[in-house]
Protein backbone atom coordinates (compact mmCIF):
# COMPACT_ATOMS: atom_id res chain seq x y z
CA UNK A 1 0.00 0.00 0.00
CA UNK A 2 2.85 2.39 0.84
CA UNK A 3 4.45 1.75 -2.55
CA UNK A 4 1.18 2.53 -4.35
CA UNK A 5 0.76 5.74 -2.32
CA UNK A 6 4.34 6.74 -3.15
CA UNK A 7 3.84 6.25 -6.90
CA UNK A 8 0.52 8.10 -6.83
CA UNK A 9 2.20 11.01 -5.04
CA UNK A 10 5.06 11.10 -7.57
CA UNK A 11 2.59 10.98 -10.45
CA UNK A 12 0.55 13.80 -8.89
CA UNK A 13 3.64 16.00 -8.54
CA UNK A 14 4.69 15.32 -12.13
CA UNK A 15 1.19 16.17 -13.35
CA UNK A 16 1.13 19.41 -11.33
CA UNK A 17 4.55 20.51 -12.59
CA UNK A 18 3.61 19.71 -16.19
CA UNK A 19 0.37 21.66 -15.92
CA UNK A 20 2.05 24.68 -14.35
CA UNK A 21 4.59 24.96 -17.15
CA UNK A 22 2.20 24.13 -20.00
CA UNK A 23 1.35 27.81 -20.60
CA UNK A 24 4.95 29.07 -20.50
CA UNK A 25 6.98 29.54 -23.69
CA UNK A 26 10.55 30.72 -24.21
CA UNK A 27 12.02 32.56 -27.19
CA UNK A 28 15.75 33.15 -27.35
CA UNK A 29 17.30 36.34 -28.71
CA UNK A 30 20.18 35.05 -30.83
CA UNK A 31 23.25 36.47 -32.55
CA UNK A 32 23.10 33.46 -34.90
CA UNK A 33 20.78 30.45 -35.16
CA UNK A 34 21.68 26.86 -36.09
CA UNK A 35 20.99 27.61 -39.77
CA UNK A 36 23.49 30.49 -39.77
CA UNK A 37 20.91 33.30 -39.81
CA UNK A 38 22.23 36.30 -37.91
CA UNK A 39 20.37 38.52 -35.45
CA UNK A 40 17.19 36.48 -35.04
CA UNK A 41 14.71 35.32 -32.46
CA UNK A 42 14.57 31.53 -32.05
CA UNK A 43 10.89 31.72 -33.12
CA UNK A 44 9.85 34.47 -35.49
CA UNK A 45 6.20 33.44 -35.77
CA UNK A 46 4.73 32.15 -32.53
CA UNK A 47 1.17 31.05 -31.85
CA UNK A 48 -0.24 31.06 -28.33
CA UNK A 49 -3.64 30.93 -26.66
CA UNK A 50 -5.15 33.74 -24.59
CA UNK A 51 -3.56 33.71 -21.13
CA UNK A 52 -0.27 32.16 -22.22
CA UNK A 53 3.04 33.77 -21.29
CA UNK A 54 6.16 34.06 -23.42
CA UNK A 55 9.58 34.81 -21.94
CA UNK A 56 12.29 36.24 -24.19
CA UNK A 57 15.78 35.26 -23.08
CA UNK A 58 18.87 37.06 -24.41
CA UNK A 59 21.85 34.90 -25.31
CA UNK A 60 24.06 38.00 -25.35
CA UNK A 61 23.84 41.52 -23.94
CA UNK A 62 22.93 43.31 -27.17
CA UNK A 63 19.29 42.23 -27.64
CA UNK A 64 15.89 43.36 -26.39
CA UNK A 65 12.17 43.31 -27.23
CA UNK A 66 10.34 46.45 -28.35
CA UNK A 67 6.63 46.21 -29.17
CA UNK A 68 5.65 47.98 -32.39
CA UNK A 69 1.97 47.09 -32.82
CA UNK A 70 -0.77 44.89 -31.47
CA UNK A 71 -4.52 44.41 -31.51
CA UNK A 72 -6.92 47.11 -30.36
CA UNK A 73 -7.33 47.01 -26.59
CA UNK A 74 -3.95 45.40 -25.94
CA UNK A 75 -1.59 47.23 -23.64
CA UNK A 76 1.90 46.99 -25.12
CA UNK A 77 4.71 47.11 -22.56
CA UNK A 78 7.67 49.47 -22.78
CA UNK A 79 10.71 48.12 -24.57
CA UNK A 80 12.89 45.87 -22.50
CA UNK A 81 16.43 46.74 -21.51
CA UNK A 82 19.23 45.28 -23.60
CA UNK A 83 20.47 41.96 -22.30
CA UNK A 84 17.54 41.49 -19.90
CA UNK A 85 14.96 38.71 -19.85
CA UNK A 86 11.38 39.89 -20.37
CA UNK A 87 8.00 38.15 -20.18
CA UNK A 88 4.54 39.00 -21.44
CA UNK A 89 1.18 37.34 -20.82
CA UNK A 90 -1.17 37.71 -23.76
CA UNK A 91 -4.75 38.55 -22.78
CA UNK A 92 -6.12 40.10 -26.00
CA UNK A 93 -6.46 37.95 -29.16
CA UNK A 94 -4.75 39.16 -32.34
CA UNK A 95 -1.33 39.69 -33.91
CA UNK A 96 1.50 41.34 -31.98
CA UNK A 97 4.59 42.69 -33.77
CA UNK A 98 7.94 43.28 -32.07
CA UNK A 99 11.60 43.80 -32.87
CA UNK A 100 15.05 44.02 -31.33
CA UNK A 101 15.73 47.75 -31.21
CA UNK A 102 19.45 47.59 -32.11
CA UNK A 103 18.94 44.99 -34.88
CA UNK A 104 15.56 45.87 -36.42
CA UNK A 105 17.19 46.98 -39.68
CA UNK A 106 18.88 43.57 -39.90
CA UNK A 107 15.48 41.87 -39.79
CA UNK A 108 15.37 40.85 -36.12
CA UNK A 109 11.59 40.90 -35.77
CA UNK A 110 8.86 38.57 -34.62
CA UNK A 111 5.11 38.08 -34.56
CA UNK A 112 2.93 36.51 -31.89
CA UNK A 113 -0.53 35.34 -32.91
CA UNK A 114 -2.88 35.01 -29.95
CA UNK A 115 -5.80 32.66 -30.53
CA UNK A 116 -6.90 32.33 -34.11
CA UNK A 117 -7.60 36.06 -34.48
CA UNK A 118 -5.72 37.65 -37.38
CA UNK A 119 -8.22 40.49 -37.85
CA UNK A 120 -5.50 43.14 -37.33
CA UNK A 121 -3.27 41.69 -40.08
CA UNK A 122 -3.80 44.79 -42.25
CA UNK A 123 -2.77 47.13 -39.44
CA UNK A 124 0.36 45.07 -38.75
CA UNK A 125 1.22 45.14 -42.47
CA UNK A 126 1.11 48.95 -42.34
CA UNK A 127 3.25 49.18 -39.20
CA UNK A 128 6.76 50.58 -39.32
CA UNK A 129 9.47 48.26 -40.66
CA UNK A 130 13.06 49.14 -41.52
CA UNK A 131 15.69 47.55 -43.77
CA UNK A 132 15.45 43.76 -43.94
CA UNK A 133 12.50 43.88 -41.54
CA UNK A 134 10.20 45.00 -44.38
CA UNK A 135 10.72 41.82 -46.40
CA UNK A 136 10.63 39.58 -43.34
CA UNK A 137 7.40 41.16 -42.03
CA UNK A 138 5.73 40.61 -45.39
CA UNK A 139 6.90 36.97 -45.43
CA UNK A 140 5.71 36.30 -41.88
CA UNK A 141 2.31 37.85 -42.57
CA UNK A 142 2.12 35.70 -45.70
CA UNK A 143 2.27 32.61 -43.48
CA UNK A 144 -0.95 33.63 -41.72
Region locations from a protein language model:
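Extracytoplasmic copper-binding redox domains, predominantly the cupredoxin/blue-copper superfamily
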Residues: 20-144
Amino acid sequence: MKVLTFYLAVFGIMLAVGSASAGARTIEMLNKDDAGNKMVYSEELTRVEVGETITWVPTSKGHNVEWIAGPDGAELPKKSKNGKEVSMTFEVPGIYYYWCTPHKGMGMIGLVVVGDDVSNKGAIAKAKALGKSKKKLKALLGEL
